[in-house]
């Protein structure tokens, strides 16, 4: 694991509005947090390869099958973040995990993602299939947030 173990624990501790996890579910939830941090914040692609199965199946319309595809997606997102990046660190989306639900081999992560400071953001649901300690499959739904069109004062996440 990279130097972000404390950050994984901090993110996990911030998940308060959800059912409790068993010990096995905690491990799975923390691995999903680690996957997101390694791939989309710290660009630790060696760790990404360790967490994602070589036969990874993708259902997002923007990403291909195979674990190389998740790295290509990371590079695209980094280039988007870099357009308005003000630091510190490397450009990345600010991902705020709201909930992680685990049921059997499935893990659902609800995330609010800001592409740059001041961005209205994106509301993301990621669904992963977990097998033998690795992510083997992924689905997602991404909703662009438009604060001007909100018909209520609640957050989307």
Q: What are the functions of these language-model segments?
A:
Residues 1-157:
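C-terminal and inter-domain tail/linker signature
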């Amino acid at each position: 694991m990279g130097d972000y173990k404390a950050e994984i624990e901090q993110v996990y501790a911030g998940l308060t509005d959800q059912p409790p996890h068993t010990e096995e579910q905690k491990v799975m939830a923390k691995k999903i947090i680690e996957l997101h941090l390694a791939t989309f914040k710290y660009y630790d692609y060696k760790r990404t390869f360790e967490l994602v199965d070589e036969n990874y199946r993708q259902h997002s319309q923007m990403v291909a099958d195979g674990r190389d595809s998740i790295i290509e997606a990371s590079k695209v997102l980094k280039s988007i973040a870099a357009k308005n990046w003000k630091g510190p660190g490397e450009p990345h989306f600010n991902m705020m995990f709201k909930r992680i639900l685990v049921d059997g081999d499935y893990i659902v992560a609800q995330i609010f993602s800001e592409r740059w400071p001041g961005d209205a953001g994106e509301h993301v649901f990621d669904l992963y299939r977990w097998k033998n300690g690795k992510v083997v499959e992924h689905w997602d739904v991404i909703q662009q947030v438009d604060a001007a069109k909100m018909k209520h004062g609640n957050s989307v996440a």
